[in-house]
Amino acid sequence: MEIILFLTMMVMIAYVFSGYLYRVALVQSSRVDLIFTRFENMCFKIIGTDLEHMSAKTYVKHFLAFNGFMGLITFVLLIVQQWLFLNPNHNLNQSIDLAFNTAISFLTNSNLQHYNGESGVTYLTQMIVMTYLMFTSSASGYAVCIAMLRRLTGLTNIIGNFYQDIVRFIVRVLLPLSCLISILLMTQGVPQTLHANLMIRTLSGHIQHIAFGPIASLESIKHLGTNGGGFLAGNSATPFENPNIWSDFIEMGSMMLLPMSMLFLFGRMLSRHGKRVHRHALILFVAMFFIFIAILTLTMWSEYRGNPILANLGIYGPNMEGKEVRFGAGLSALFTVITTAFTTGSVNNMHDSLTPLGGLGPMVLMMLNVVFGGEGVGLMNLLIYVLLTVFICSLMVGKTPEYLNMPIGAREMKCIVLVFLIHPILILVFSALAFMIPGASESITNPSFHGISQVMYEMTSAAANNGSGFEGLKDDTTFWNISTGIIMLLSRYIPIILQLLIASSLVNKKSYHQDKYTIAIDKPYFGVSLIVFIVLLSGLTFIPVLLLGPIGEFLTLK
């Protein structure tokens, strides 16, 4: 019952909050201008931008240059961190390949961690590298999404200014909400300190080092920005990051808020005046929520069903391996599905210990990469499936393929298909390389089907910019650091460039057909068609390899 109440409440909050995002996205005046305008203007002066509207090509150039500069600075700081200040625990520099992976991971909003949070980075790099990139990577995804929506909806005839979009989102959305969430987490017991690790003597007489630090400030943006990188190696399964059920709900709600609000924002932009959400966006929301609930049901059923091997021994009950007793199987399954649907990657349980079908659920969500998804980018990926559905359905019934009164032509379809293919190609090709390259498969710690699942999950998590993992995999090696780094880089930037190209190409076309010659995108049957095409297209792509992994493990586990 508490899960139903929580999900209902988050949908309502996201719907209301999308109205505020509408004013932020369209640079409309609001009551908070007096608070934020001066700070924004100061940021614009520091950046040196004149706030002139950019072309799509210029927008992408500045987006890539901004991200490239941040990535370079991050890489340098990680390989020299031991010689800098705010390192009371004397943590060492990262190796070249690990720093490459870490920099790309946080730059692309993936937060895939091949290092231990306690010893792999210093307080300085946690705050000015990890936390900073959690803000900017999230805001970058939002900015390019808003640029795409401005073009698709035709609400304005400009694409916007990249620096204005990213600064306004950080100042007016991320910073205020992060401060609020940090305070709420601190009230629940999440630490926020610059003191060195505690050294205590246990009851058995041994010396124990307890790691903590500025956790609350990172924890808030980690979930709000759908980042996922943990301050500690155990991530949100540790009491210092996620002490109790209330902090658990706060963190899950933080993950869901902005991606769901972005979908409602799209609906408000379609309705022109922003007072209501267009029916088309509501259809998309219901379709995605249906898939979300279906995967959640599968995961919870599998986890509550438990391990059949233990059942044969007379030990019945839910699967509690790798789970925190304070959360149990139910909230652990909910957190797992939310963190993979919204591509956050934080965990409150160990995904490697999930049952076969329990691990299949989050893996499928990352393979789809459209069920709400991350900040902005998730909606952009969903719109690619929407365009595919419109094109195929239109041709099936003999109507003109148009979306929002814009004809979909051969040029757009080439880009759409390329965006669709990038994701599975990266996952499947690099997974195959993991078994072909000598030494790479030595990182696998489980034989047979589950070992294949470990590899598939790691590559899928990198391609979806998620960051969670089957952590039985020994992934801090040269192969895994370089391969997943390349995957995260390509899967982030190539689709974004193509998606903005698609939007700019569509907006230059005008429809010469009446509504009766095009399919209706605001009817329930379109939502059903969208679900069917998502399942069919992804199923044909990934079912063979899933049979070798979690499905095969499920069928043989007796």
UniProtKB/Swiss-Prot annotation:
Membrane topology: Multi-pass membrane protein
Cell compartment(s), UniProt: Cell membrane
Major localization listed first in the record, in broad terms: membrane
Annotated transmembrane regions: 1-21, 66-86, 127-147, 166-186, 245-265, 281-301, 327-347, 354-374, 377-397, 416-436, 482-502, 531-551
Assigned keywords, A-Z: Cell membrane, Ion transport, Membrane, Potassium, Potassium transport, Transmembrane, Transmembrane helix, Transport
Top-level taxon: Bacteria
GO molecular function: P-type potassium transmembrane transporter activity; potassium ion binding
One protein family per Pfam: KdpA
Secretion signal, residue range per the UniProt entry: none
InterPro entries assigned: KdpA
GO cellular component, one term: plasma membrane
Complex formation: The system is composed of three essential subunits: KdpA, KdpB and KdpC.
NCBIfam families: kdpA
Described function: Part of the high-affinity ATP-driven potassium transport (or Kdp) system, which catalyzes the hydrolysis of ATP coupled with the electrogenic transport of potassium into the cytoplasm. This subunit binds the extracellular potassium ions and delivers the ions to the membrane domain of KdpB through an intramembrane tunnel.
PANTHER family xrefs: POTASSIUM-TRANSPORTING ATPASE A CHAIN, POTASSIUM-TRANSPORTING ATPASE POTASSIUM-BINDING SUBUNIT
Entry similarity comment: Belongs to the KdpA family.
Protein known as: Potassium-transporting ATPase potassium-binding subunit
Organism name: Staphylococcus aureus (strain bovine RF122 / ET3-1)
Gene this protein is translated from: kdpA
